[in-house]
């Protein structure tokens, strides 16, 4: 009944991944991002992650697997997803939704930390403000974006961009794979 739809969806996902893999810069960016994060942890830093909607869930997933575990037991790594509901509702009410991430970065970010900003469009105003706040703090910035990178293009130390201009879910599918690879590489770097 739905076999054609299922095949089409999986083929489109495979095509998106194949297009991402065609650009060696993506592979190098993932490696550089993992080393940057591990170096921050080794120096006593932490990572703050943020995004909206599905990207918010990806930011939480990233932090959870760093503080908890990925595939193997190991010490937890210092990662915080900016996802505290009381913080988000307070800042949204008192300052506006565009400031929910930047206020948190201003409060707990410090030089040597890393911000991971996730946006499939690259145009999330609150993530862009978080990047600016991270820069003010002397933090490094990694972004996971899609399409042409949007307004976030060129704002990060390392941008990992999925060049897909269709639905956001295709971009998110690559983002979660990148997140898992980052964690795997961080684990390898941390035991060097």
UniProtKB/Swiss-Prot annotation:
<feature type="binding site">
    <location>
        <position position="65"/>
    </location>
    <ligand>
        <name>substrate</name>
    </ligand>
</feature>
<keyword id="KW-0963">Cytoplasm</keyword>
<comment type="similarity">
    <text>Belongs to the SIS family. GmhA subfamily.</text>
</comment>
<feature type="binding site">
    <location>
        <position position="61"/>
    </location>
    <ligand>
        <name>Zn(2+)</name>
    </ligand>
</feature>
<dbReference type="InterPro" id="IPR046348">
    <property type="entry name" value="SIS_dom_sf"/>
</dbReference>
<dbReference type="InterPro" id="IPR004515">
    <property type="entry name" value="Phosphoheptose_Isoase"/>
</dbReference>
<comment type="subunit">
    <text>Homotetramer.</text>
</comment>
<feature type="binding site">
    <location>
        <position position="65"/>
    </location>
    <ligand>
        <name>Zn(2+)</name>
    </ligand>
</feature>
<keyword id="KW-0479">Metal-binding</keyword>
<feature type="binding site">
    <location>
        <position position="180"/>
    </location>
    <ligand>
        <name>Zn(2+)</name>
    </ligand>
</feature>
<dbReference type="GO" id="GO:0005737">
    <property type="term" value="C:cytoplasm"/>
</dbReference>
<comment type="pathway">
    <text>Carbohydrate biosynthesis; D-glycero-D-manno-heptose 7-phosphate biosynthesis; D-glycero-alpha-D-manno-heptose 7-phosphate and D-glycero-beta-D-manno-heptose 7-phosphate from sedoheptulose 7-phosphate: step 1/1.</text>
</comment>
<comment type="function">
    <text>Catalyzes the isomerization of sedoheptulose 7-phosphate in D-glycero-D-manno-heptose 7-phosphate.</text>
</comment>
<feature type="binding site">
    <location>
        <position position="172"/>
    </location>
    <ligand>
        <name>Zn(2+)</name>
    </ligand>
</feature>
<feature type="binding site">
    <location>
        <begin position="119"/>
        <end position="121"/>
    </location>
    <ligand>
        <name>substrate</name>
    </ligand>
</feature>
<keyword id="KW-0413">Isomerase</keyword>
<dbReference type="GO" id="GO:0008968">
    <property type="term" value="F:D-sedoheptulose 7-phosphate isomerase activity"/>
</dbReference>
<feature type="binding site">
    <location>
        <position position="124"/>
    </location>
    <ligand>
        <name>substrate</name>
    </ligand>
</feature>
<keyword id="KW-0119">Carbohydrate metabolism</keyword>
<dbReference type="GO" id="GO:0008270">
    <property type="term" value="F:zinc ion binding"/>
</dbReference>
<dbReference type="GO" id="GO:2001061">
    <property type="term" value="P:D-glycero-D-manno-heptose 7-phosphate biosynthetic process"/>
</dbReference>
<feature type="binding site">
    <location>
        <begin position="52"/>
        <end position="54"/>
    </location>
    <ligand>
        <name>substrate</name>
    </ligand>
</feature>
<dbReference type="InterPro" id="IPR001347">
    <property type="entry name" value="SIS_dom"/>
</dbReference>
<feature type="binding site">
    <location>
        <begin position="93"/>
        <end position="94"/>
    </location>
    <ligand>
        <name>substrate</name>
    </ligand>
</feature>
<dbReference type="GO" id="GO:0005975">
    <property type="term" value="P:carbohydrate metabolic process"/>
</dbReference>
<protein>
    <recommendedName>
        <fullName>Phosphoheptose isomerase</fullName>
        <ecNumber>5.3.1.28</ecNumber>
    </recommendedName>
</protein>
<dbReference type="InterPro" id="IPR035461">
    <property type="entry name" value="GmhA/DiaA"/>
</dbReference>
<keyword id="KW-0862">Zinc</keyword>
<feature type="domain" description="SIS">
    <location>
        <begin position="37"/>
        <end position="192"/>
    </location>
</feature>
<dbReference type="Pfam" id="PF13580">
    <property type="entry name" value="SIS_2"/>
</dbReference>
<feature type="binding site">
    <location>
        <position position="172"/>
    </location>
    <ligand>
        <name>substrate</name>
    </ligand>
</feature>
<dbReference type="GO" id="GO:0097367">
    <property type="term" value="F:carbohydrate derivative binding"/>
</dbReference>
<dbReference type="InterPro" id="IPR050099">
    <property type="entry name" value="SIS_GmhA/DiaA_subfam"/>
</dbReference>
């Amino acid at each position: 009944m739905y076999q054609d739809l299922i095949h089409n969806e999986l083929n489109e996902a495979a095509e998106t991944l194949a297009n991402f893999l065609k650009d060696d810069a993506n592979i190098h960016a993932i490696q550089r991002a993992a080393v940057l994060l591990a170096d921050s942890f080794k120096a006593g830093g932490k990572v703050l992650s943020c995004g909206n909607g599905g990207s918010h869930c990806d930011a939480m997933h990233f932090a959870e697997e760093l503080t908890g575990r990925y595939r193997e037991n190991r010490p937890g790594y210092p990662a915080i997803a900016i996802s505290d509901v009381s913080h988000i509702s307070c800042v949204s009410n008192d300052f506006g939704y565009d400031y929910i991430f930047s206020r948190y970065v201003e409060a707990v970010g410090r030089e040597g930390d890393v911000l991971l900003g996730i946006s499939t469009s690259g145009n999330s105003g609150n993530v862009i403000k978080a990047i600016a706040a991270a820069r003010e703090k002397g933090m490094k910035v990694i972004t996971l974006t899609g399409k042409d990178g949007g307004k976030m293009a060129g704002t990060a130390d390392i941008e990992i961009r999925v060049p897909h201009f269709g639905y956001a879910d295709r971009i998110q599918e690559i983002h979660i794979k990148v997140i898992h690879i980052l964690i795997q590489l961080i684990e390898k770097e941390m035991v060097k």
